[in-house]
Amino acid sequence: EIQLRKRYDLIPNVLSIAKKYMEHEKSTFDQITKLRTEALSNSDAEDPSAVAKLFSDDAKLSGMMGKLMVSMEAYPELRAVESMKEAMATYQDVEDNISAARRFYNSAVNELKNAVDIFPSSMIASAININAMPFYEDPESDTIQSTVNAAEFFDKS
């Protein structure tokens, strides 16, 4: 949750720098701001459904930020701005930290799931109302990578 909050705190900085150069991307900025607000409002870390909603909102936000990064490629003057370079480097560092935290979280969730599902700890878990938490899936893992056939590139006939 700390790493996600760092990302959410960084997003306004990236958007404010980018807005100066990308006026016609206003709808993207508005969607990102709305998703950020929704994600920040989901703060009950003990409720599995709230955590699942947070992860869902985060996946949408991550996708929108990816879209923004792609559209930034069309603005070489924006990529040349030093503050944007720093913001993007910081954003990438935060994404790397989120990836590491995701692995740690999923490992802990797996251990909890095993404890909740396996007897005798399952009896204790149900008695004190402990439920398994949702896994934090990487939104990038859902994208299907197309297979590249290298022979097509070398076949000139």
Annotate each PLM feature:
Residues 1-157:
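A helix-centric hydrophobic-segment signal that preferentially recognizes long
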